[in-house]
Amino acid sequence: MRVQASVKRICRNCKIIRRKGVVRVICTDPRHKQRQG
């Protein structure tokens, strides 16, 4: 899980979602998981 100021899609499987006011990236590749912090 990467914590970044700006989250970006790394590949085409990455999806940007909002969960409880937190912007997250979920992907089939676990290395692409990100959270905005």
Swiss-Prot record:
Protein's GO biological process: translation
Keyword Ribosomal protein attached: yes
InterPro entries assigned to the protein according to its UniProt record, in alphabetical order: Ribosomal_bL36 (IPR000473), Ribosomal_bL36_sp (IPR035977)
GO molecular function: structural constituent of ribosome
UniProt name for this protein: Large ribosomal subunit protein bL36
Entry GO CC: cytoplasm; ribonucleoprotein complex; ribosome
Disulfide bonding pattern of the chain: none
PROSITE patterns for the chain: RIBOSOMAL_L36 (PS00828)
Family matches, as NCBIfam families: rpmJ_bact
Domain of life: Bacteria
Family that this chain belongs to: Belongs to the bacterial ribosomal protein bL36 family.
Source taxonomy: Bacteria, Pseudomonadati, Pseudomonadota, Betaproteobacteria, Rhodocyclales
Keyword terms: Ribonucleoprotein, Ribosomal protein
Protein's UniProt keywords contain Ribonucleoprotein: yes
